[in-house]
Amino acid sequence: MRPTHWSSNQCEVDFTAEALTTLSLSNRNHEEDPIQPVLKNSNLFLLNRDIWSLIINYLDAFDILRLMHSSRQFYYWLRKSAVDECCFNNNFLNLQPYQRTVPVASDLEWATEVDLYGNPPILKLQLRDSFVWSMLAKFQGLQTIALDGTGVTISSVTNILLNIPTVKTLSIRWCVGVCSLSLIEFLQNSKSRTFSLENLYVLGVKGLELLKPVLLDGSEDDTLTSNWHSRVILFQNALDALPTTHGNPVECDISRCPLNACKIAGQETELADLFSLQKVPACIYCLREWKKPICRYCIDLRSCLVCDSFVCPSCISLDFDLQIQAFARQHRVISTLGVVYPEREDSCFHKIKAAQWHQISPRSLLFQFQEQNHIHHKKIRRKLLAAGWKWPQSQI
C-alpha cells in the first residue's frame, strides 16, 4: 500500500514510465529496458531531457522538426546532445533525405545501414572536408547527396556543386561548419554557371538556424530576429537568381511567406511552414492543392475551424484574410484564456479590456467565436455560388 504522503508527481512518473516502456517494447526488443536509467536518476519526476532521450529514436523527421518549432528547450537540447541515430521515414518531403551515397564496404562510419529502421543514422561531425574530397570520385553520377550533421565546410559544398554536375538534391542541414554568408557569396558569384540542382536543404547551418522557434499557435511573442530575417532574404534572392538547366528556381526548406496578411498583423518575420502545408487539404473552391510556401499564420486564417476546409490564395485574395483576421486573433486569446485564467472574472487582463467578458465565460466566448466563423463561412459560400462558382456535390 502506498504511503499517505505519496504525491501526484509520483503517479505521473508511474504513468509516464508505463507508457514509455510500452512504447519501447512495441518498437524495439532490447534486452535492457531504456526506462530504468532514468527512473534511477530521477526520484519524483522525469525531466524533459530524460523523456526526449527516450523517445528521440522513435520520432521521424516530421515529428522532430515540429518539436523544434514548438519547444525552444527541445531545439537547444537537440543541438547540444550527441544523438547517435534517429528514425527518418522515406515520406519526408516526398524524397529520401538520407540515402546511401557510398557502398557500406567503403566506409562503415559513413553509410552504415540500420537493420531496424532501414535508413542510415545521422552522420557524425568527425566526417570533414578531407574525407569528402577523397570520395569525390565515387560521388560522380549521384543525384542525391546528404551531408546532414557532418563537419564539412563551404569548400566541400562548392566542390560538390562545381565538380558533380548530376547532383539534383544536396542536403547540408545542421552542418555547423557551413556559414550562411559564405554560402550566399558562392551563390552570388556563380551566376555565370548553370547547375542541375533542384533541391537545397540548409536548415540549421550557421546563420540560418532557428534562433527563436515560432510556436504552433502562431504566437506573436516568439518571432524571429531581424538579422536572421535579413539573411533569409539575401539567401533566397541569391538562390532564385542561380541559373539552372531545368529553368525553375532551386527549392529550399528556408523561405518567407509570400502573402501580406502575416505582415499586416505584425508577423513580417514569420517563416513559411512546409510541414504544416503537408496537412492542409485541397482548396474547397478550385479543388487544387496549394504547393507554394505559406506561413502558419496565413494557414490558420484560410482554414475554417468548423468544417476544416481550406481556401487557397488564388481563389480569394487578401480581402478574405482581412475579414476573418479579427476572428482568428479572438480565437487565440480565448483558447488560452481558459488555461491561464480558468473561469476567473476580474483578474484577466483581456476581460478588463472588454466589458462583455465580465459576464461571459471563456467557453461561451469560444462557442460564440465558432458560431460567428461558421456564419461568415456560409456567407462567403453563398456569394461564390452567386458569382458562378460550381460547388462539388460532396461539399454542399
UniProtKB/Swiss-Prot annotation:
Gene Ontology MF terms: ubiquitin-like ligase-substrate adaptor activity
CC annotations in GO: cytosol; ubiquitin ligase complex
Cystine residue pairs: none
Keywords for the protein's UniProt record, in alphabetical order: Cytoplasm, Ubl conjugation pathway
InterPro entries: F-box-like_dom_sf, F-box_dom
SUPFAM superfamilies for the chain: F-box domain
Pfam families (alphabetical): F-box
UniProt key word Transit peptide: no
Subunit and interaction comment: Part of a SCF (SKP1-cullin-F-box) protein ligase complex. Interacts with skp1.
Protein name: F-box protein pof13
